[in-house]
């Protein structure tokens, strides 16, 4: 005979959690807004302003996640309750197993919405850029920066964030000196923003024949793409614009012409680069968009003193403080902020970062 009480307890628990989220997300207001946005998107005139139409489309997706999940939880839990009652009456183990399976699926849906509670920032829903910069240490540090690049590309692919390599600067012997990735998709910035900081590698270097342990550093800085409604005042006289021949992965198609663009905002010494298009004009437009996003995020960090990242953002080693150590010989990767560890170093380096990201978001970083 099957155990009914644990299932009934789980149904009540999920119902209580759904009710809590209904209040937290202001379900009634979101449902009303969803109807308004859907009506606007059905209008034939909406595409007269493509950027507004895209913004409305993003808003609708975010609203649907909340409204549809809560609606599905309400109806789904009612259906499961009915299945459990039927299974008990008929003493039908197969029906009971179906009810349990459906309950597990509903819990996963609810957990996703609970996780979204942590995305409370005004730009968490946005696409984002991720800059990687190797620290001092020559070839070993540049190889580490390349490993970090691969790690985040893999993470982005696994989460369908369409990672796009905007720019990469090759290392002197191996690896890279720096790179920029763009991630496109809902909550890309919210998911990655706690990865800003210094990532430290400890290993026996393959570039040192003596087999000594080396410590290398690599900085990561994550910032959201901003829309045109946010005014960023940039004086053209403050910019130094250089063209150069692209190098490295992502630039192989533009090496024959100097189409890559580097823009330096002289007052803040903020540098952005773009080389992923054959057109110098398109690369320049993309780099300017990236520069505006970066300057905006740096200004937000300055205003957000409790994060203590603004001044670190100007240091040579990178942006933010040291956040995670990757000690490969001991098979241990540890987040220094949350204490979360993983012994599966290869899995993490292959992009399995969710455990670290979720813990940092839950801790309010």
Swiss-Prot record:
- Give UniProt keywords alphabetically: Cytoplasm, Methylation, Protein biosynthesis
Q: Which domain of life is it from?
A: Bacteria
Choose one Gene Ontology CC annotation of this protein and give it. cytoplasm
**Location, primary (coarse class):** cytoplasm
Provide the record's note on post-translational modification: Methylated by PrmC. Methylation increases the termination efficiency of RF2.
Keyword Oxidoreductase included in the entry's annotation: no
GO MF annotations in UniProt: translation release factor activity, codon specific
Asked if the keyword Protein biosynthesis belongs to this entry, the reply reads: yes
Q: Which PROSITE patterns match?
A: RF_PROK_I
Q: Which Gene3D superfamilies match?
A: 3.30.160.20, 3.30.70.1660, Release factor
Location in the cell? Cytoplasm
Q: Which residues carry this modification: N5-methylglutamine?
A: 252
Q: What does this protein do?
A: Peptide chain release factor 2 directs the termination of translation in response to the peptide chain termination codons UGA and UAA.
Protein family membership: Belongs to the prokaryotic/mitochondrial release factor family.
Q: What is this protein called?
A: Peptide chain release factor 2
**Whose protein is this, by species?**
Shewanella woodyi (strain ATCC 51908 / MS32)
Mind giving the lineage of the organism this protein is from?
Answer: Bacteria, Pseudomonadati, Pseudomonadota, Gammaproteobacteria, Alteromonadales
